[in-house]
From Swiss-Prot:
Keywords: ATP-binding, Cell inner membrane, Cell membrane, Lipid transport, Membrane, Nucleotide-binding, Translocase, Transmembrane, Transmembrane helix, Transport. It is an enzyme of class 7 (translocase). It comes from Photorhabdus laumondii subsp. laumondii (strain DSM 15139 / CIP 105565 / TT01). One of its GO terms (cellular component) is plasma membrane. PROSITE patterns: ABC_TM1F (PS50929), ABC_TRANSPORTER_1 (PS00211), ABC_TRANSPORTER_2 (PS50893), MSBA (PS51239). Residues 27-309 form the ABC transmembrane type-1 domain. This is ATP-dependent lipid A-core flippase. SMART domains: AAA. Homodimer.
Amino acid sequence: MNDKDLSTWQTFCRLWPIVSPFRIGLIVAAVALILNAAGDTLMLSLLKPLLDEGFGKASSDVLKWMPLIVIALMIMRGLSGFVSSYCISWVSGKVVMQMRRRLFSHMMGMPVSFFDQQSTGTLLSRITYDSEQVASSSSSALITVVREGASIIGLFVLMFYYSWQLSLILIVIAPIVSLVIRVVSKRFRSISKNMQNSMGQVTASAEQMLKGHKEVLIFGGQNVETERFNKVSNHMRQQGMKMVSASSISDPIIQLIASFALAFVLYAASFPDIMETLTAGKITVVFSSMIALMRPLKSLTNVNAQFQRGMAACQTLFSILDMEQEKDDGKLELKKANGDIEFRNVTFCYPTKELPALQNISMYIPAGKIVALVGRSGSGKSTIANLLTRFYDVNEGNIFLDGHDLREYKLSSLRGQVALVSQNVHLFNDTVANNIAYASENRYSREEIEKAAEMAYAMDFIRKLDNGLDTMIGENGVLLSGGQRQRIAIARALLRDSPVLILDEATSALDTESERAIQAALDELQKNRTSLVIAHRLSTIENADEILVVEDGHIVERGDHLSLLERNGVYSQLHRMQFGQ
């Protein structure tokens, strides 16, 4: 993540284009807040006529019209309070939605390496918690700044109107208060960043337990996970207490500064020259206004913590939005590729690794042929598939499809030529039919979806489901067995009918009987298309046109099944290990 420290103003300037489309709501809210603050000031100003005329003169009419004014002011405060709260909430909701949409859209365009380096819990926290913090903290801060700022201005005007000499004393404390706020602001920003990171750790810890709850139960890891969660939760609590401490310390400092000013005002009011200009009503209004200033001053100090929290969250989100998305500089588009694939001197190293996963790999797969990759775990087989789909880009060398470097094609066009069935099947919380026709629900007919399911030998169990193809399968197909989930994925690939097929341990989750049944469908699927088959079970690739043996990122053997057995090398050794020969 980019932790470049942006000033509050710079961060706010970046946020403003997102907020500005809803500025009418902000303007209405600001006007309502000013009216709300004006109501408080006007209520306070009624003290002078009440004391000097209402109680001072027996025949005064002040006491007769004063109740009507009070009722009118209270109605104004109530209505303005409602309007301001509604408008701010409306703007806040819109900003949260826009931030989440922008973040979600940007993340979808990020390279696979980005997700490899970030925990799912942390990213979820960014989309949910941080986005909410930007709007809620900033909107709360805006309400306080406008309302309390208007209150301070109104109270100063009131004080200067009745006694400018006494009011000048308060001007002295303004620079001191601003200095305190500035010092505390830096502390708030630092703590807010730590709180966001802590929230990401809390989310990641909870997500890890929820996703791996079976492993936690079977291995007795409850204490380990509880301790881990308690640790990150306590760290977040500590950051929260630091925020409270910084805020709590700044409050009494400002109040102490203000109290000295008030004490000096009382002392100055006893000077004969000043006393001659004051009445009981005037001194009461001036002194009451000074006491009333304490509340907005305290609120403005506290709002700084809220605003800094929002700006820190905003900065974190912008650091993600500033990250470069997948490079998609290609211009070529394919309707349907022939399927000629060539790897030429390809070397690749994962961003977080020191040693390359593939070194100087070269191979050619003619259109319509089946090439199998075999080797021990971690040898680099799946990396080859990842490079062919441009989930990663090569560090050295080139990969060609129909004679053109993969980087010359638009990403969407390139990936549209490839159907992928991996050992890690991901299904969506949707119906069986929509999972088979994922992202193309309106492109295929019901009959085509059902035919693909039949070819994948999936209709046998689909018919037994409560609603057949319209059955909801839960998050990641939790209501299906591993083999059933894999058959749905194979049906998805069959329906897509792409010219290039990648089978990455496609039958690994199937039992022997299901594997035999589906192998016929896979054999039919592989006809007239280029197939790259990554296999652990060697029995599934005996009929491949060519078998490549990958070891430590190198192709160490190549040939068909029989020739590799006769060579008595790595492939022959793997074969003997599997079949007990």
